């Protein structure tokens, strides 16, 4: 019994381990991987490994795994990666798993600076990545520092701006909050729609030379072949769509591309190693096949997948609507509960206020009753004193009258009578004065007693109002709510030194529709506005001395009004012969 081979396959978000037989082919292993992760759009992907010479290589599907140049390690390591890219992610990617794998791979490419991304776009993409991971921003859940462990922006961008890590996170948090209501899957798609407009997105670069020996870059992507100058990977100078190519072949380091235009010469370049020509051929064949397939009616399988994806998307929307309805209902009940508690607290406060007012009124009433009794007692004493003084005065008058009679009846000494008379007269005057004062006091006490009586009557009326006021209404009673949320290409098959492949262009519907495209920022005003705002914000913190060569090229392209698709239209102008001649002259 042959000993099994342990294999570890690393996808963008998981590690899978298998035990395969020595005679297992690359396709059998590939099929096992895609079945495990539930992927049906298999044509974009491949298994990559590092060969015995340290070069990254795609596993050949038609050969045994053990017969290829894989390293003898346990387990044998493979990466499951996108080998080919769609032209337009929004139109072509069908399954959520496909979309997620592309999102993670493109994000990694941007963060590692494999794909150049300008600062304002990097921040906006970072906010979509946060939405894709965390969902809607929630102030209660997403406290300060919730992004501290996330890789969000290329290190190059952070180094170029005088902003702390916290300030970067604050900016991304603000834009994260802007995406409220967006599904995680939708956030991934928005990320890819913006990322696919980056100049280096989806391109495989190879070092080549033309017949003159000029060092150049060959870019192979979903739309065709592009030629770049050695110091500029952002701006292609010449382009050839796949629909213009009928045959590709190589012999050793020489690569020959035959155009459909019979009058045009062959497009010839040289690669430094035979291995590179094999990879170029493999990518050309696969990209050409997908380019042509996209321009033909969908196969039955793709139609079924799209129908299923639409149904799943519709189901997700229904589930989301149900969740939103439940969430709104829950929020309404929570608000009602909070309102009830507030009203209850207000009623309790009002009740306490009533009780305090009642106690104060009772206390004031008691004090006023006591004061009124004191005033009444003082008035009574003053009245008695006044009556006593009046009695004394009357007695003095009687005595005076008696003395006068005695003076008339008796003859006394004039001096004695005069003295007695003067004495009683003075006493009478004093008593008269005292009587007047007492009368004034009595009048004043009577006035104060009347005021006290009026206050007493008023206080009794207030107390009567408080005591007879209706009690506060009881707090409303809410029934508890029961929540129920439903969960619910070909591969390398090259000969040792050479290979040739015919590329058919028959039956396609529109071979150059990619030249009509515009960027996401150009067709989406919201994205355009967000990028402009971010650019203005970041310009104030930018350190111009730390700009890279790619930054300078990108800014110059922006200044001249160029973008990926305008450049594409420009580099395909003229016939095939003119462009090949231009390539030879570089």
Curated annotation (Swiss-Prot):
A GO MF label: protein kinase A catalytic subunit binding
Assembly and binders: Interacts with PODXL and NHERF2. Found in a complex with EZR, PODXL and NHERF2. Interacts with PALS1. Interacts with MCC, PLEKHG6, SCYL3/PACE1, NHERF1 and TMEM8B. Interacts (when phosphorylated) with FES/FPS. Interacts with dimeric S100P, the interaction may be activating through unmasking of F-actin binding sites. Identified in complexes that contain VIM, EZR, AHNAK, BFSP1, BFSP2, ANK2, PLEC, PRX and spectrin. Detected in a complex composed of at least EZR, AHNAK, PPL and PRX. Interacts with PDPN (via cytoplasmic domain); activates RHOA and promotes epithelial-mesenchymal transition.
Location of region: Interaction with SCYL3: 244-586
Residues forming coiled coils: 302-462
Keyword terms of this UniProt record: Acetylation, Cell membrane, Cell projection, Cell shape, Coiled coil, Cytoplasm, Cytoskeleton, Membrane, Phosphoprotein, S-nitrosylation
A GO CC term assigned to this protein in UniProt: uropod
Activity regulation field: A head-to-tail association, of the N-terminal and C-terminal halves results in a closed conformation (inactive form) which is incapable of actin or membrane-binding.
Lineage, uppermost ranks: Eukaryota, Metazoa, Chordata, Craniata, Vertebrata
Keyword Coiled coil: yes
Free-text comment about domains: Has three main structural domains: an N-terminal FERM domain, a central alpha-helical domain and a C-terminal actin-binding domain. The FERM domain is organized in a clover-shaped structure that comprises three subdomains identified as F1 (residues 2-82), F2 (residues 96-198), and F3 (residues 204-296). In the active form, the subdomain F3 adopts two mutually exclusive conformational isomers where a row of four phenylalanine side chains (Phe250, Phe255, Phe267 and Phe269) must point in the same direction. In the autoinhibited form, the F3 subdomain interacts with the C-terminal domain (residues 516-586) and stabilizes the structure, selecting only one possible arrangement of phenylalanine side chains.
Localization annotation: Apical cell membrane; Cell projection; Cell projection, Microvillus membrane; Cell projection, Ruffle membrane
Gene3D superfamilies reported for this sequence: 1.20.5.450, 1.20.80.10, 6.10.360.10, Phosphatidylinositol 3-kinase Catalytic Subunit, Chain A, domain 1 (3.10.20.90), Pleckstrin-homology domain (PH domain)/Phosphotyrosine-binding domain (PTB) (2.30.29.30)
GO terms classed as biological process: actin cytoskeleton organization; actin filament bundle assembly; astral microtubule organization; cellular response to cAMP; cortical microtubule organization; epithelial cell differentiation; establishment of centrosome localization; establishment of endothelial barrier
Function: Probably involved in connections of major cytoskeletal structures to the plasma membrane. In epithelial cells, required for the formation of microvilli and membrane ruffles on the apical pole. Along with PLEKHG6, required for normal macropinocytosis.
Keyword check for Nucleotide-binding: no
Positions bearing Phosphoserine: 366, 535
A Pfam family: FERM_C
Residues bearing PTM Phosphothreonine: 567
PROSITE patterns: FERM_1, FERM_2, FERM_3
Domain of life: Eukaryota
Organism annotation: Rattus norvegicus
Classification via SUPFAM superfamilies: Moesin tail domain (SSF48678), PH domain-like (SSF50729), Second domain of FERM (SSF47031), Ubiquitin-like (SSF54236)
Protein known as: Ezrin
Membrane topology: Peripheral membrane protein
Principal place of residence: membrane
Residues with PTM N6-acetyllysine: 60
Post-translational modifications: Phosphorylated by tyrosine-protein kinases. Phosphorylation by ROCK2 suppresses the head-to-tail association of the N-terminal and C-terminal halves resulting in an opened conformation which is capable of actin and membrane-binding.
PANTHER family per record: MERLIN/MOESIN/EZRIN/RADIXIN
């Amino acid at each position: 019994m042959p000993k099994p081979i342990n294999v570890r396959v690393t996808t963008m978000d998981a590690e899978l381990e298998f035990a395969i037989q020595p005679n297992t082919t690359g396709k059998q292993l590939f099929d096992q991987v895609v079945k495990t992760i539930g992927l049906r759009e298999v044509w974009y992907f491949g298994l990559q490994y590092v060969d015995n010479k340290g070069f990254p290589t795609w596993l050949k599907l038609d050969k045994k795994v053990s017969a290829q140049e894989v390293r003898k390690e346990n387990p044998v390591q493979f990466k499951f990666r996108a080998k080919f890219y769609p032209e337009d992610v929004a139109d072509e990617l069908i399954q959520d798993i496909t979309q997620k794998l592309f999102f993670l791979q493109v994000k990694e490419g941007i963060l590692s600076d494999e794909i150049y991304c300008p600062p304002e776009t990097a921040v906006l993409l970072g906010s979509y990545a946060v939405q894709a991971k965390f969902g809607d921003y929630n102030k209660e859940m997403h406290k300060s520092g919730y992004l501290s462990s996330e890789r969000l922006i290329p290190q190059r961008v952070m180094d170029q701006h005088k902003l702390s890590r916290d300030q970067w996170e604050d900016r991304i948090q603000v834009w994260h909050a802007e995406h409220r209501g967006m599904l995680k899957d939708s956030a991934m798609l928005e990320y890819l729609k913006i990322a696919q407009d980056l100049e280096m997105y989806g391109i495989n670069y190879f070092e080549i030379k033309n017949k003159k020996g000029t060092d150049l870059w060959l870019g192979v992507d979903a739309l065709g072949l592009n030629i770049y100058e050695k110091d500029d990977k952002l701006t292609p100078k010449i382009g050839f769509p796949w629909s213009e190519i009928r045959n590709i072949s190589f012999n050793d380091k020489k690569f020959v591309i035959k155009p459909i235009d019979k009058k045009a010469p062959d497009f010839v370049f040289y690669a430094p190693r035979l291995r590179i020509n094999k990879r170029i051929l493999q990518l050309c064949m696969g990209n050409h096949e997908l380019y042509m397939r996209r321009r033909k009616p969908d196969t039955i399988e793709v139609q079924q997948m799209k129908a299923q994806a639409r149904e799943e998307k519709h189901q997700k929307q229904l589930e989301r609507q149900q969740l939103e309805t439940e969430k709104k209902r829950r929020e309404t009940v929570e608000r009602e509960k909070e309102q009830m508690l507030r009203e209850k607290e207000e009623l309790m406060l009002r009740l306490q206020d009533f009780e305090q007012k009642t106690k104060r009124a009772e206390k004031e009433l008691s004090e006023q009753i006591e004061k009124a009794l004191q005033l009444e007692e003082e008035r009574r004493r003053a009245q008695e004193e006044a009556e006593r003084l009046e009695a004394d005065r009357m007695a003095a008058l009687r005595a005076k009258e008696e003395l006068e009679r005695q003076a008339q009846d008796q003859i006394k000494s004039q001096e004695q009578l005069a003295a007695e008379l003067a004495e009683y007269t003075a006493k009478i005057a004093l008593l008269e004065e005292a009587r007047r004062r007492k009368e004034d006091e009595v009048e004043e006490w009577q006035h104060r007693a009347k005021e006290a009586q009026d206050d007493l009557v008023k206080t009794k009326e207030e107390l009567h109002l408080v005591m007879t006021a209706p009690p506060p209404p009881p707090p409303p009673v809410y029934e508890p709510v029961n929540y129920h949320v439903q969960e619910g290409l070909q591969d390398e098959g090259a000969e040792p030194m050479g290979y040739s492949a015919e590329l058919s262009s028959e039956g396609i519907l529109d071979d150059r529709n990619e030249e009509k495209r515009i960027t996401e920022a150009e067709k989406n005003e919201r994205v355009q506005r967000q990028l402009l705002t971010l650019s203005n914000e970041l310009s104030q913190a930018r350190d111009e001395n730390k700009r890279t060569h790619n930054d300078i090229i990108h800014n110059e392209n922006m200044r001249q009004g160029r973008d990926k698709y305008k450049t594409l239209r420009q580099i395909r102008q003229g016939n095939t012969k003119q462009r090949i001649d231009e390539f030879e002259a570089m």
